[in-house]
Every structure is written in C-alpha cells, then in structure tokens.
Amino acid sequence: MKYPLVPLVNELTFSFLVFWLCLPVALLLFLLIIWLRFLLSQDSEENDSDVCLDWEPWSKNPDEFCQEEMLHSQEEERPCC
C-alpha cells in the first residue's frame, strides 16, 4: 500500500490545517510581544532614578579629556603626607 486511503491534505482540509497549525504560533508571538512590552515598560519605570550618566567627557574634545585624565593620574601617584 503506497498511499493512504484518505489523503490528509486536500482542497477541503488545507485551510483547516493551515488555520490550526498557524493559530498557536500566532498566539505565542502575540503573547511574546505583550510580555516583552510589559518587561520593557517595567524596567524603564524602576530604573529611571538609577540611570546616571556622566556626559561631560563626551562633550569635551579628546585632547582636553586626555589631559584631564593625565592630571588625575599624576595626582594619584603623589604620596600624601
């Protein structure tokens, strides 16, 4: 017996199978998007006060920043009496 007596996929069952096979994938994708949006909104609410970036070095020229770093390193090397 080469072929089944009743074919699984034909004109009548194709749309039914596509619907029931794609529905779980679509629902999982939808729930994943909702869950990620919830996590991202929760993270931004909790950590608003924790974020403290020092933008001053980025606003300076690289030469000024390097000179300032050299001054700080020289101050640290000097022993305090």
Curated annotation (Swiss-Prot):
InterPro entries: Adipogenin. It is a single-pass membrane protein. Its main location: membrane. The keyword Cell membrane does not apply. One of its GO terms (biological process) is positive regulation of fat cell differentiation. The keyword Chaperone does not apply. It is found in: Membrane; Nucleus. It comes from the Eukaryota. The chain crosses the membrane at residues 16-36. Keywords: Membrane, Nucleus, Transmembrane, Transmembrane helix. Highly expressed in subcutaneous, perirenal and mesecentric adipose tissue. Pfam families: Adipogenin. Induction: Up-regulated during adipose differentiation of four different kinds of preadipocytes prepared from subcutaneous, perirenal, mesenteric and parametrial adipose tissues. GO terms for cellular component: cytoplasm; lipid droplet; membrane; nucleus. Belongs to the adipogenin family. Plays a role in stimulating adipocyte differentiation and development. This is Adipogenin. The lineage of its organism: Eukaryota, Metazoa, Chordata, Craniata, Vertebrata.
